[in-house]
Amino acid sequence: MEDFVRQCFNPMIVELAEKAMKEYGEDLKIETNKFAAICTHLEVCFMYSDFHFINEQGESIVVELDDPNALLKHRFEIIEGRDRTMAWTVVNSICNTTGAEKPKFLPDLYDYKENRFIEIGVTRREVHIYYLEKANKIKSENTHIHIFSFTGEEMATKADYTLDEESRARIKTRLFTIRQEMANRGLWDSFRQSERGEETIEERFEITGTMRRLADQSLPPNFSCLENFRAYVDGFEPNGCIEGKLSQMSKEVNAKIEPFLKTTPRPIKLPDGPPCFQRSKFLLMDALKLSIEDPSHEGEGIPLYDAIKCMRTFFGWKEPYIVKPHERGINSNYLLSWKQVLAELQDIENEEKIPRTKNMKKTSQLKWALGENMAPEKVDFDNCRDISDLKQYDSDEPELRSLSSWIQNEFNKACELTDSIWIELDEIGEDVAPIEYIASMRRNYFTAEVSHCRATEYIMKGVYINTALLNASCAAMDDFQLIPMISKCRTKEGRRKTNLYGFIIKGRSHLRNDTDVVNFVSMEFSLTDPRLEPHKWEKYCVLEIGDMLLRSAIGQMSRPMFLYVRTNGTSKIKMKWGMEMRRCLLQSLQQIESMIEAESSVKEKDMTKEFFENKSETWPIGESPKGVEEGSIGKVCRTLLAKSVFNSLYASPQLEGFSAESRKLLLVVQALRDNLEPGTFDLGGLYEAIEECLINDPWVLLNASWFNSFLTHALR
């Protein structure tokens, strides 16, 4: 490209471009496309000015170079191509002698006939996009903009093209020639793709014809034309008095602005009532795994084979019995369902060849547990039109529940490290493009911090269960299929490990719509005695099914093994999102990355290495009643990941509403902390909107409690 530039352009232009690049500290050996762009822009500016003069009568005339009248006054003053100091001297001189307004940015030319500065643009993109970028950067009515493209298009302020058609045609022909020459040498594609936009884009262009008529018709009441409305909008001072803005609005808007002070906000009111209960689709901190290391059995990787192999590792099975009944369920059916699973697994083991999948016998206990024949009969609406008292059945309001300590314990546990590795390096995704070294480094550091995290185990468990359940729902719609709940990991030594958490039995699953529900019964192993926190296990029937020998510092001890059984349901859309729980890794990585970027911009260098390797530095993790909690960067990574995972596990309309409404209050509080003197109206309405989302969801209640801690410490 450098050779092409030196051959293609006048040596004077090349020299000016070299000086300009040197002035801005750019290396023309590296930035060859920029070198070509500067030369092109300089040549267009010179061609724009060439042959244009002003005669004694003040008229613009075009005169060829060898004309004796060439001593006439030049129409254009060339500013582009001068060093910055000299260029500003020329601009100041023009402003002083002509009374023109001083521009914020150095323009390219001054037109003595029209008495205006001109900004010349040469773009490899679409002219209107580049024009908008230029207009928004300059933000001046007094600088005229004229854009040329390499395809022969042009655009100018108010469609005023300044020059005669022949002069503009010369410029377009020259640009087209440059493009052809570059293309012949295989340089054009690289040059075209290398153009960077101006800083910002603001669409401020003339609207004409049909669009103009539509714009005039679409105005709010009391505005006669688009110009009036624009003037009104421009008159809205962004930091002006809110009351003034409100007074300009419709008479129906009646809002009194109250100053928001440190004493203004009150805590969010959490509901009273019985403690909230566990509602996740699978057990979290209370789950127990039956595991096999370095699996190499026949059929390894087939879920049913893996499950049977894991079940064989436990020898403490005993006659199951109910230790915590479900208050409203037929608990004997849950007990019989587990016995049926054990019996049918035993039958499989007695067969010569283990099948790849297992469909359970449709016994009365499973039919009850899976809600078979329980759905009300659907009747076509047209057949009901004549029924006078036809109405939707009454549904009870959900019972209010209070915050319980178990959900905070669940979250704390999700942030902890386990002794297994749950994701490989490529779980977040390999580099698709030759991405910069820094991005890969950040990903590797982040993966190292979260690969052992319990929240990561929940991701892999959720992905597996949802994938298996969705597959079975589509492949075996009428069957009560037995689905093992499995995960895979590596030990610290790198040995592979397969884990069995329990089983799911899927009900009938003719899922036509995304929201159609498939019922399932989950049966999950645990060492947690449900009688310690019975309120947490309201939806479960818990059986004692065996005794497990555990090694501890004082020797072996026996602990009862429980089975948590419940009826549950999910839908195609929920399973689809459950299968994509790995997104949580990406979301939390991006949050960490924005922290690194903020730090790097302060230090003016990439801080990734220091960020992760400076073990002595602590970072804010969150608020608690004790104040701002701080921890290592690894703890921050794991906490952000756990929050993202819990948002997925406990997704609900209550969470959506609380997040959206509490964010508004958060922004006002942050504005107060930044001394921006915020004002509010209808703060009571905002609190009402937040508090109507606090019903019974444990994760939402915990977030509301955290928000109250934040309010307390933020407003001290």
From Swiss-Prot:
Cofactor(s) required, per the database record: Mn(2+)
Binding positions (Mn(2+) 1): H41, D108, E119, I120
Cofactor-binding details, from the entry: Binds 2 manganese ions per subunit.
GO CC field: host cell cytoplasm; host cell nucleus
PTM annotation, UniProt: Phosphorylated on serines and threonines by host kinases, including human casein kinase II.
GO molecular function, one term: RNA binding
Keyword Phosphoprotein (UniProt): yes
UniProt keywords, alphabetically: Cap snatching, Endonuclease, Eukaryotic host gene expression shutoff by virus, Eukaryotic host transcription shutoff by virus, Host cytoplasm, Host gene expression shutoff by virus, Host nucleus, Host-virus interaction, Hydrolase, Inhibition of host RNA polymerase II by virus, Manganese, Metal-binding, Nuclease, Phosphoprotein
Gene Ontology biological process: cap snatching; DNA-templated transcription; symbiont-mediated suppression of host gene expression; symbiont-mediated suppression of host mRNA transcription via inhibition of RNA polymerase II activity; viral RNA genome replication; viral translational frameshifting
Sites where the protein binds Mn(2+) 2: E80, D108
InterPro entries reported in the protein's UniProt record: INFV_PA, PA/PA-X, PA/PA-X_sf
Motif placement: Nuclear localization signal 2 (NLS2): 184-247
Pfam family, one: Flu_PA
Role noted for this protein: Plays an essential role in viral RNA transcription and replication by forming the heterotrimeric polymerase complex together with PB1 and PB2 subunits. The complex transcribes viral mRNAs by using a unique mechanism called cap-snatching. It consists in the hijacking and cleavage of host capped pre-mRNAs. These short capped RNAs are then used as primers for viral mRNAs. The PB2 subunit is responsible for the binding of the 5' cap of cellular pre-mRNAs which are subsequently cleaved after 10-13 nucleotides by the PA subunit that carries the endonuclease activity.
The protein's assembly and partners: Influenza RNA polymerase is composed of three subunits: PB1, PB2 and PA. Interacts (via C-terminus) with PB1 (via N-terminus).
Family: Belongs to the influenza viruses PA family.
Protein known as: Polymerase acidic protein
Organism annotation: Influenza A virus (strain A/Memphis/110/1976 H3N2)
Taxonomic path: Viruses, Riboviria, Orthornavirae, Negarnaviricota, Polyploviricotina
